[in-house]
Amino acid sequence: MREYIDAAAFKEMMLCADAALSDNIQIINDLNVFPVPDGDTGTNMSLTMNSAAAELRKKSFDAIDAAASCVASALLRGARGNSGVILSLLFRGISRRLKGIETAGAAEFAGALSDGVDAAYKAVMKPAEGTILTVSRLAAAAAVEAANAGASLESALECAIRAGD
């Protein structure tokens, strides 16, 4: 069982996230009914994450903060639509929390997720529930609660996944 996320693990997580978004574009598009049922959330999130994955594939990192910073920058540059911008904001907050950190355990990573949510909510003029913001908030809160209860990194991430499902 992994007790911390290092740069290589973070990179692999992001590449897996890119693949998962690509594989589920239509499902996410079909969920997109608010605030405008334009059916492009999955497409925009996937295209945005593609830009981060492309950057990650070109580089190796010694610490999680460098990998997170790379992801945040690439997402911002490649953001498509509102959901892509929100995704980039989430990772801007995550990256800021991980600054100066080589590896992240359950508490550090859960805190980074929480900071990502805070950054996204603060940047959106009128945050609407029932969106990517809500899913992110629920996932981060579950990770923080689990980490605060002494859960392992793996357990905290599993709690986040279940809460966001």
Where are the model-predicted features located?
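N-terminal loops that bind phosphate or other acidic moieties
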Residues: M1-D165
